[in-house]
Swiss-Prot record:
It holds the Pfam family Aminotran_5. InterPro entries: Aminotrans_V_dom, Aminotrans_V_PyrdxlP_BS, Cys_deSase_IscS, Cysteine_dSase, PyrdxlP-dep_Trfase, PyrdxlP-dep_Trfase_major, PyrdxlP-dep_Trfase_small. It is found in: Cytoplasm. The lineage of its organism: Bacteria, Pseudomonadati, Pseudomonadota, Gammaproteobacteria, Vibrionales. It comes from Photobacterium profundum (strain SS9). Homodimer. Forms a heterotetramer with IscU, interacts with other sulfur acceptors. One of its GO terms (molecular function) is 2 iron, 2 sulfur cluster binding. Keywords: 2Fe-2S, Cytoplasm, Iron, Iron-sulfur, Metal-binding, Pyridoxal phosphate, Transferase. Its EC number is 2.8.1.7. The active site is at C328. GO terms for cellular component: L-cysteine desulfurase complex. This is Cysteine desulfurase IscS. [2Fe-2S] cluster binds at C328.
Length: 404
């Protein structure tokens, strides 16, 4: 077993060796290095053929038409293109958008930008388990609602929203429906025909493909129109200009092909690891699981260890690569906005750790992690006067702290 152990698969995954091998074939003079937009010679034709194959592989994982796949630089760009592109195109019909407070920043920040442009955004509160109440969602819809953006799986707590039901609601009300599926693609079955989703953002590096490449699914029937955010050579049917990165696209295609074949195998593997970790920790005192445990992707576990500062625990677990919050926000010392939206107080939100497992995680690593976590938590609690007070039965909420 090699240290440190990687338990941060929700932040990114290592590239699968099979994917890396395919990518290597598209880089050098001996390989398929041409520009897919070069129509006048064989190098361009071969590159275009490789891109077309990858486009089919990406479409295949979500039961889409390859012509509905637009390649981007990743899920952040896909989210921006979907949200700003759709909102601006349909702004004559209305300027109201609905989303949720626990969305990724790549959804929340484009919404904030649209607010500066005169749009109104409703940010829904999730329930305490992280799921959205359908009645509240229905009540938020107005005459001028043009767009709804709800993520499939949350990046911090791994809960799965009922995208099929939300899709039906949006279709009934003629609202464009965007889903950020960065954390669900390749982990859960996605069928765009059954789900009635109009726009889906996906990325490659969360399912063992390379970073820097993603895609946006844009429905053709009924056709969804977008205002381009990137202008240039008119690539990707005018929706996203820029030379296509053949090696990254081929890598993404191969990662999606493998995911389709091995999705169930990966799910069973990660679920067994999560259950093992949970079984090893659940008898500890004051341990709180964040988010619904049933409606949850198998590779994620987010736990708060009360009376332990999250940052100190991260430092104590120096041989485990885990995170507090998402990778995009774990550098800040603010408590997770996702956990705050679930109603956790600052202390509990601050003491949370996200474990995420993957294809290359092992039982041996889990067993090592259990020992390390139990030792670290016990040691840190021994140093905490609050833990002593809690053990003595003092209600910490009723204590009046002196201000100096």
């Amino acid at each position: 077993m090699k240290l440190p152990i990687y338990f941060d698969y929700s932040a990114t995954c290592p590239v699968d060796p099979r994917v890396a091998e395919k990518m290597m074939q598209c880089l050098t003079m001996d390989g398929n290095f041409g520009n897919p937009a070069s129509r006048s010679h064989r190098f361009g034709w071969q590159a275009e053929e490789a891109v077309d194959t990858a486009r089919e592989q990406v479409a295949d994982l979500m039961n889409a038409d390859p012509r509905e796949i637009v390649f981007t630089s990743g899920a952040t760009e896909s989210d921006n293109l979907a949200i700003k592109g759709a909102a601006r195109f349909y702004s004559k019909k209305g300027k109201h958008i609905i989303t949720c407070k626990t969305e990724h920043k790549a959804v929340l920040d484009p919404c904030r930008q649209l607010e500066r442009e005169g749009f109104e955004v409703t940010y829904l509160d999730p329930e305490a388990n992280g799921l959205i109440d359908m009645a509240k969602l229905r009540d938020a819809i107005r005459e001028d609602t043009v767009l709804m953006s709800i993520m499939h799986v949350n990046n911090e707590i791994g809960v799965i929203q009922d995208i099929t039901a939300i899709g039906e609601l949006c279709r009934e009300n003629k609202i464009v429906f965007h889903v950020d599926a960065a954390q669900s693609i390749g982990k859960l079955p996605i069928d765009v025909q059954a789900m009635k989703v109009d726009l889906i953002s996906v990325t490659s590096h969360k399912i063992y493909g390379p970073k820097g490449i993603g895609a946006l699914y844009v429905r053709r029937k009924p056709r969804i129109r977008l205002e381009a955010q990137m202008h240039g050579g008119g690539h990707e049917r005018g929706m996203r200009s820029g030379t296509l990165a053949t090696h990254q696209i081929v890598g993404m295609g191969e990662a999606f092909r493998i995911a389709k074949e091995e999705m169930e195998q990966d799910r069973v593997h990660t679920l067994a690891l999560r259950t093992r970790l949970l079984d090893g920790l659940k008898d500890m005192e004051s341990v709180h699981i964040n988010g619904d445990l049933e409606q949850r992707v198998s590779s994620n576990l987010n736990i708060s260890f009360a009376f332990v500062e999250g940052e100190s625990l991260l430092m104590a677990l120096k041989d485990l690569a885990v995170s507090s919050g998402s990778a995009c926000t774990s550098a800040s010392l603010e408590p997770s906005y996702v956990l705050r939206a679930l109603g956790l107080d600052d202390e509990l939100a601050h003491s949370s750790i996200r474990f995420s497992f993957g294809r290359f995680s092992t039982e041996e690593e889990i067993d090592y992690a259990i020992t390390q976590i139990r030792t670290a938590v016990e040691k840190l609690r021994d140093m905490s006067p609050l833990w002593d007070m809690h053990k003595e039965g003092i209600d910490l909420n009723s204590v009046e702290w002196a201000h100096h």
